[in-house]
UniProtKB/Swiss-Prot annotation:
This is Imidazoleglycerol-phosphate dehydratase. It is an enzyme of class 4 (lyase). The keyword Amino-acid biosynthesis applies. Belongs to the imidazoleglycerol-phosphate dehydratase family. It catalyses: D-erythro-1-(imidazol-4-yl)glycerol 3-phosphate = 3-(imidazol-4-yl)-2-oxopropyl phosphate + H2O. GO terms for cellular component: cytoplasm. The keyword Manganese does not apply. It comes from Renibacterium salmoninarum (strain ATCC 33209 / DSM 20767 / JCM 11484 / NBRC 15589 / NCIMB 2235). Disulfide bonds: none annotated. Its EC number is 4.2.1.19. InterPro entries: IGPD_sf, ImidazoleglycerolP_deHydtase, ImidazoleglycerP_deHydtase_CS, Ribosomal_Su5_D2-typ_SF.
């Protein structure tokens, strides 16, 4: 299998983003988004997916962090799609249930070429919590929406339990990381593209 790496720079009037990935890495990361809690989540995503990840981003965070957070997720989705190439030899599906103390999240990934997100189970009011001083709970869904759309993957994310807003978000990122790790891993028994259609 050839090197599964990708790099993309994306600039708008609202943000400037650079993302690099190596799907066959060891979970090394270099993250700077100017949003500390988001840095923490992306570092966890890299560590638990074993995808090497470099992110350098800046934006109009004096207005709101939303633009920078979403634009990083868009760019990350695009580099994941590019790094996957034709998806030959991958497992395609991945699933993980991950706890963080009282929080529990379940993620299922299908590298299907058809973007779709089902996101459920967050407790009422989670979207209004301000985490780490900048990151509102509502951004969690926005991040997963942007990644799934631009990576062209299907993701079912379900929060099964949780009380602490930080833990609820982090459990989701870690569950996504482990499910993604399984889905993008190469499987020596897979001959070609894992689809009866012959295309993903």
């Amino acid at each position: 299998m050839s090197m599964r790496t990708a790099r993309l720079e994306r600039s708008t009037s609202e943000s400037s983003v650079l993302v690099e990935v190596n799907l066959d890495g060891t979970g090394k990361s270099e993250i700077e988004t100017t949003v500390p809690f988001y840095n923490h989540m992306l570092t966890a995503l890299s560590k638990h997916s074993l995808i090497d990840l470099r992110v350098k981003a800046s934006g109009d965070t004096d207005i709101d962090v939303h633009h920078t957070v979403e634009d990083v997720a868009i760019t990350l989705g695009e580099v994941l799609r590019t790094a996957l190439g034709d998806k030959a030899g991958i497992r395609r599906f991945g699933e993980a249930t991950i706890p963080l103390d009282e929080a529990l999240a379940h993620a299922v990934v299908d590298v299907s070429g058809r973007p779709y997100l089902v996101h459920s189970g967050e407790p009422a009011g989670q979207e209004y919590h301000l985490i780490g001083g900048h990151f509102t709970g509502s951004l969690t869904r926005h991040v997963f929406e942007a990644i799934t759309l631009h990576a062209q993957i299907c993701l079912h994310m379900r929060v099964l339990a949780g009380r602490d807003p930080h833990h609820i978000v982090e459990a989701q990122f870690k569950a996504f990381a482990r499910a993604l790790r399984s889905a993008v891993e190469s499987d020596p028994r897979v001959d070609g593209i894992p689809s009866t259609k012959g295309l993903l």
